[in-house]
Amino acid sequence: MHEFELEGHEFIELHNLLKVIGLVHSGGLAKTLISEGLVKVDGEVELRKRCKIRVGQLVEFEKEQIKVSA
């Protein structure tokens, strides 16, 4: 499981989170994977590329999980 700290920010957009963590090499690829329904947020398929991910949420892509903390 990966952990990502927002470091004082209120949120991070879903496509940026996948890129920053290193699960994808580009934001464009992240957007494509999200629009294809391959990413879940809190157990639900998320199709919004710019979905705001906040503290306490869990993002899943393939077999990887990302927990977002403050």
Identify the residue ranges that each predicted region occupies:
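A detector for short, charged/polar N-terminal pre-domain segments
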Residues: M1-I12
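A positively charged, amphipathic N-terminal helix/segment that binds anionic biomolecules
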Residues: H2-F4, L58-A70
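A basic, amphipathic helix-loop patch mediating RNA/tRNA/ribosome contacts
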Residues: I12-V55
